[in-house]
């Protein structure tokens, strides 16, 4: 075992992964050598999710499992960071005595100094404050040869959705400087990234905290100029802020892929108003995007079982999903998170009813997804080749431009010689519920 080795376990969303890479950079600066094996690490860093209670349970279970390495003596220091720490703070000190250091989202950028203080004899275990820091990305650890990467363009959230804790966990909306984002993007491409996925709690609010009207459009136009960057993907786009200018920019771009992730949450006006999203008109937004961006793939997320949702409301939502035919769909049963307005609302839908509604929508979406993918069979399309299949070296895997990393399906490459990290032409030969099979033809 390396005398000063460290391992990372990153839970939750892509935005958390960006924070994790920043903390890894700080560990490397302290002299740690990163290892993928937690059993060989002297220091284990866990970046947690605290958005939903189910995610909190997963985070706690993970920490307790990793604490076993402290008991066995292989791990000297267990560090827990992120949203769960920001949400529960001091309560975790007694709940998880095995943990040496806790950092909220407010202090992830200061991991290095916290470890140094601890090694110098400090007995402080928790650092947490109201999140107001904006990371410029300069210290983010970049992995050589990775074909796809995330770029976080803002911190926090300025929306006040009734069901959501993000403003409390992440603070107010704070845009990064465009110059810092572009510098990071250039570094990622220089390290081998062909695809950059733009993330934030709300990407379409970029620049609004500074009074900038078309900051996101300007950023996308600047990313367009980066040589060797092939694909730019926009995730977490708040529906109300998808402007005609953004749609036009995407439709005219050579690099921004025809893909939008728009979390609509529901389609019934009364439910949307109760959620704190009364300005959203889902049908109008979807129609504007589909008419303005040819061949666009849409991903959305929906919440079923929100307080006050009747059977008629759910039937309206089902009809909306069937009519709209989203390429990708995530469905969540309402979770009454303590501290949110929604947790105090009357007319609670029984959890078993909410779960059944979720199953109905997911089954409906399974058929929609398969029909969408079957329409691609026989077409020749570019594929980002990502590497060998996790279960066999006989298959390569990749993604189409209409498939986001981790969230959507994949391309199973059954024939042809491919180069991981390259975008190559393929012919789609078969479709499944969420994945397609394809044969590689040549480089695009």
Swiss-Prot record:
Matching Pfam families: Radical_SAM, TRAM_2, UPF0004
EC number assigned by the record: 2.8.4.4
InterPro entries tied to this protein: Elp3/MiaA/NifB-like_rSAM, Methylthiotransferase, Methylthiotransferase_CS, Methylthiotransferase_N, Methylthiotransferase_N_sf, NA-bd_OB-fold, Ribosomal_uS12_MeSTrfase_RimO, rSAM
Gene Ontology terms for molecular function: 4 iron, 4 sulfur cluster binding; aspartic acid methylthiotransferase activity; metal ion binding; protein methylthiotransferase activity
Record keywords, A-Z: 4Fe-4S, Cytoplasm, Iron, Iron-sulfur, Metal-binding, S-adenosyl-L-methionine, Transferase
Start and end residues of each MTTase N-terminal domain: 4-120
Cofactor note: Binds 2 [4Fe-4S] clusters. One cluster is coordinated with 3 cysteines and an exchangeable S-adenosyl-L-methionine.
Reaction catalysed by this enzyme: L-aspartate(89)-[ribosomal protein uS12]-hydrogen + (sulfur carrier)-SH + AH2 + 2 S-adenosyl-L-methionine = 3-methylsulfanyl-L-aspartate(89)-[ribosomal protein uS12]-hydrogen + (sulfur carrier)-H + 5'-deoxyadenosine + L-methionine + A + S-adenosyl-L-homocysteine + 2 H(+)
Positions contributing to [4Fe-4S] cluster 1 binding: 13, 49, 83
Keyword field contains Protein biosynthesis: no
This protein's GO CC annotations: cytosol
Cellular localization per UniProt: Cytoplasm
Residue ranges of domain TRAM in the record: 374-442
Alphabetical GO biological process terms: tRNA modification
Family statement drawn from the similarity comment of this UniProt entry: Belongs to the methylthiotransferase family. RimO subfamily.
Function: Catalyzes the methylthiolation of an aspartic acid residue of ribosomal protein uS12.
Record-given protein name: Ribosomal protein uS12 methylthiotransferase RimO
Organism of this sequence: Syntrophobacter fumaroxidans (strain DSM 10017 / MPOB)
Record gene name: rimO
């Amino acid at each position: 075992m390396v005398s000063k080795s460290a391992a990372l376990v990153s839970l939750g969303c892509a935005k958390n992964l960006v924070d994790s890479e920043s903390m890894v950079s700080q560990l490397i600066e302290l002299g740690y050598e990163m290892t993928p094996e937690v059993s060989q690490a002297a220091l284990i860093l866990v970046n947690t999710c605290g958005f939903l209670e189910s995610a909190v349970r997963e985070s706690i279970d993970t920490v307790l499992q990793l604490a076993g390495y402290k008991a066995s003596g292989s791990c000297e220091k267990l560090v827990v960071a992120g949203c769960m720490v920001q949400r529960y703070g001091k309560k975790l000190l007694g709940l998880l005595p095995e943990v040496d250091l806790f950092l909220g989202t407010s202090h992830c950028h200061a991991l290095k100094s916290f470890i140094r203080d601890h090694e110098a004899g400090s007995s402080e275990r928790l650092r947490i404050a109201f999140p107001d820091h904006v990371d410029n990305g300069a210290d983010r650890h970049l992995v050589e040869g990775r074909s796809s990467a995330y770029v976080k363009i803002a911190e926090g959230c300025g929306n006040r959705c009734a069901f959501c804790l993000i403003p409390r966990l992440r603070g107010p909306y704070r845009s990064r400087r465009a110059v810092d984002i572009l510098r990071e993007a250039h570094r990622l491409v220089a390290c081998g990234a062909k695809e950059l996925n733009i993330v934030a709690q709300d990407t379409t609010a970029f620049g609004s905290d500074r009074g900038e009207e078309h900051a996101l459009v300007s950023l996308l136009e600047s990313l367009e100029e980066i040589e060797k960057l092939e694909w730019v993907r926009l995730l977490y786009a708040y529906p109300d802020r998808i402007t005609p200018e953004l749609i036009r920019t995407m439709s005219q771009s050579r690099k921004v892929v025809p893909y939008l992730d728009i979390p609509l949450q529901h389609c019934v006006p009364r439910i949307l108003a109760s959620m704190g999203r009364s300005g959203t008109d889902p049908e109008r937004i979807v129609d504007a995007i589909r008419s303005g961006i040819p061949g666009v793939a849409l991903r959305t997320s929906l919440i079923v079982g929100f307080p006050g949702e009747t059977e008629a409301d759910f039937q309206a939502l089902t009809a909306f999903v069937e009519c709209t035919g989203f390429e990708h769909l995530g469905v969540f049963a309402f979770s009454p998170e303590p501290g949110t307005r929604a947790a105090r609302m009357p007319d609670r839908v029984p959890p078993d009813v909410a779960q059944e509604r979720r199953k109905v929508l997911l089954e409906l979406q399974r058929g929609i997804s398969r029909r969408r993918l079957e329409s691609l069979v026989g077409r020749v399309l570019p594929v980002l080749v990502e590497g060998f299949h996790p279960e066999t070296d006989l298959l390569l895997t990749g993604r189409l431009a209409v498939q986001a990393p981790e969230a959507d399906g994949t391309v199973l490459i059954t024939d042809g010689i491919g180069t991981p990290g390259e975008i190559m032409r393929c012919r789609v030969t078969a479709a499944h519920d969420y994945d397609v099979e394809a044969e590689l033809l040549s480089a695009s």
